[in-house]
From Swiss-Prot:
Transmembrane portions of the chain: none
Family listed: Belongs to the SufE family.
Species lineage: Bacteria, Pseudomonadati, Pseudomonadota, Alphaproteobacteria, Hyphomicrobiales
UniProt name for this protein: Uncharacterized SufE-like protein RHE_CH01250
Superkingdom: Bacteria
Organism: Rhizobium etli (strain ATCC 51251 / DSM 11541 / JCM 21823 / NBRC 15573 / CFN 42)
Pfam families (UniProt xref): SufE
Length: 148
């Protein structure tokens, strides 16, 4: 299996373990870029204004899919960005939230996890704000769907 595919398929636990193992920020930065390279490209027809995440300096798109119980659906996400490091951040956000019930997503504070692994403090303020915008959008969607 190509290295990039393994990275994309990595669970959040694997990403956390890899971050802990990589104690140098430069190595972590390269790892985030590798995660982004492994992220499947979002189809052009999904790069719409409705899917664009506001508050990101780079262009970021998130697409939400739901399945299962309409009162607490399982949510999965597709995403993409026009910037390498941000694509990696998208991959981490997707690993954090995809495949979980809406109620769990709404309650999950990804920034607690991101801080624990040393991700947030090493990002520029623009990237950190963009990451917050992605997380906020996903959690808000989950709150609406969990309440439906």
């Amino acid at each position: 299996m190509p290295k990039g595919e393994r990275l994309f398929m990595a669970s959040l636990d694997q990403i956390i373990d890899d971050f802990v193992f990589l104690d140098d920020w430069e190595d972590r930065y390269r790892y985030v870029i590798e995660l982004g390279k492994a992220l499947p490209e979002l189809a052009e027809e999904k790069r719409t204004p409705e899917n664009k995440v506001m508050g990101c300096a780079s262009q970021v798109w998130l697409v939400t899919h739901t399945s299962g119980d309409p009162e607490n659906p399982i949510m999965s996400f597709e995403g993409d960005s026009d910037a390498h490091i941000v694509r990696g951040l998208v991959a981490i956000v997707l690993a954090t939230y995809s495949g979980k019930p809406a109620s769990e997503i709404a309650a999950l504070d990804a920034f607690e996890i991101f801080s624990k692994i040393g991700l947030v403090e090493n990002l520029s303020s623009q990237r950190s704000n963009g990451l917050r915008s992605m997380v906020k959008r996903i959690r808000e969607e989950a709150k609406v769907r969990a309440a439906a």
